[in-house]
């Protein structure tokens, strides 16, 4: 499995959140061989989305010439996306939110009903990423783990 990790912490490799994500990845590697690629988002040049929607009309190519072109290619080649980030002001850090906003070329303007919710249809087939939906609860559980006074606790129960 090809795993792409987005490290959204400004602390880069010293991030407590990344430490916990590494434990998750180590467990995945014990179960089966994995190919892991990590991106420190703070080190990448990613401009802000202009909202021009040119990517919707020119074959999903963004008009901005920055590192997102390479990152979008890596996303398309991945089987699993892991977003590792600390919670700042109840959400992800701005640099990671910017990266998520720039994933707009991967969706289309078309909408479809999925379990009573309308969502944008992808411009490409992302069916192999369905694995993420089953692990949605990991985010909630892991998010509660990183309080300073709990830093040295054993979190392996949350990763099972």
Walk through the language-model features, giving the residues of each.
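Glycine-rich phosphate/pyrophosphate-binding loop and the adjoining helix
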Residues: 1, 12, 26, 30-31, ...
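N-terminal beta1-alpha1-beta2 submodule of the flavodoxin-like/Rossmannoid cofactor-binding fold
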Residues: 1-108
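Conserved beta-strand scaffold positions in the cores of enzyme catalytic domains, especially
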Residues: 5, 36-38, 126, 154-157
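Cofactor-binding loop segments of dinucleotide-utilizing enzymes, especially the Rossmann-like FAD-
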Residues: 8, 41, 129-133, 159
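Repeat-unit-sized solenoid/scaffold elements
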Residues: 64-81, 118-119, 147-160
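Short, glycine-/small-residue-rich phosphate/pyrophosphate-handling segment
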Residues: 110-156
